[in-house]
Regions:
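Conserved protein kinase catalytic domain
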Residues: 22-26, 57, 190, 206
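Metal-dependent phosphoesterase signature
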Residues: 50-83
Length: 216
């Protein structure tokens, strides 16, 4: 297959459909209404992701990463994830997970699917138990730097990157990547992307990745 050698996937709204990591965790903790309002304000550019993190971090104090993973496993994940990642990995494509949500969620997917690197907002933990204290904030600009830094260290240019995402946190990366797919995306992400795709099966990105690379 003729593919971009680096493909970056977003998490919330892209791989996790119809909800977010924060909303799933909030439902578990009985805080759904509060997080829904935070996410509305974030997508309206009224607040930054650090406000979301600071407000919700304390609710997770004393909860184990294993508990959180079990909650996330029951989420509505897009069809075709395993098959898509397997095809890309078999074509020697480096897979990155670029997200601004909690990094423990990204680590769950790295363990399951073998992403070369993942990003996210970090929380202190001891012996697998979350502290409720944010140790590193992460926003859409950090997400771009995460990809830029990984590419620089691994010998790739940003023109060799295909980015797949759905919303505000993907826009800076879309502007820098060689190819970008707005997948089931918001209008701002669609406007920033080189390609727009609506589908409930991730395998549909494969043909688009191949055809786009062939005309580069």
């Amino acid at each position: 297959m003729s593919l971009y050698p680096v493909v970056v996937f977003d998490l919330d709204g892209t791989l996790l459909r119809g909800t977010t990591v924060s909303l799933l965790v909030a439902q578990w903790l009985g805080r759904e209404g509060e997080v829904s309002e935070l996410e509305r304000a974030f997508h309206a550019h009224e607040i930054s992701n650090s406000v979301v993190a600071d407000t919700s971090a304390g609710w997770l104090a004393g909860k184990s990463v294993a508990e959180a993973w079990r909650v996330l496993e029951d989420g509505s994940w897009i069809d075709g994830m395993a098959e898509t990642f397997q095809v890309l990995a078999g074509a020697q494509v480096s897979l990155l997970l670029g997200t601004i949500t909690w990094s423990f969620a990204a680590e769950m997917l790295r363990e399951r699917y073998g992403f070369q690197a993942v990003s996210g907002t970090e929380m202190q933990a001891s012996n697998g138990v979350l502290s409720g204290v944010v140790s590193r904030y992460f926003d859409e600009h950090d997400k771009l730097r995460f990809v830029e830094d990984w590419c620089a260290q691994s010998g790739y240019s940003m023109s060799q990157v295909a980015a797949i995402g759905d919303s505000r946190s993907d826009v800076p990366l879309f502007h820098r990547a060689g190819m970008s797919i707005a997948l089931n995306a918001t209008p701002d992400a669609q406007a920033a992307a080189t390609h727009v795709l609506d589908t409930e099966n991730l395998r549909d990105v494969l043909a688009l990745l191949q055809s786009a690379r062939e005309v580069v």
